[in-house]
Amino acid sequence: MASTVAGLSMSAESLRLPLLIGVSSGMLSVSDAEVLPSFLFKSGFSVLQSAALDTDDDLARGLSLLDLLPLVLLSPFFEEDVDEEEAGDVEGLDGFVFVFRLLLPLYNQSTGTSNSVLVIIT
């Protein structure tokens, strides 16, 4: 599956990365998680899991800032909020694709891991 967003052609196969989606209470609730797969599949990404993440609780359990480095906060980069009616539309993903492609190699290099990222949509 391929998609062109922000002038970049990509596919889940070419990126070869598992994408974990965490949904917090800002833009989408956990009950809305079923709208995410179609939204992201249309953008060429695979959704392996949808889960809620409470950052404060995770920090209280001893996660360091380095542990939280793979979190990419999308809301500042969306031109518009994404809801169920817009779930199939790739508008607003330009910033996400840019930041994702910029940060992921840096994260992989700094941690020695390979192509995984946890995305929190707030």
Swiss-Prot record:
Keywords for the protein's UniProt record, in alphabetical order: Signal
Signal peptide positions are 1-33
* Other known facts: Completely overlaps GIP3.
Q: Under which name does UniProt file this protein?
A: Putative uncharacterized protein YPL136W
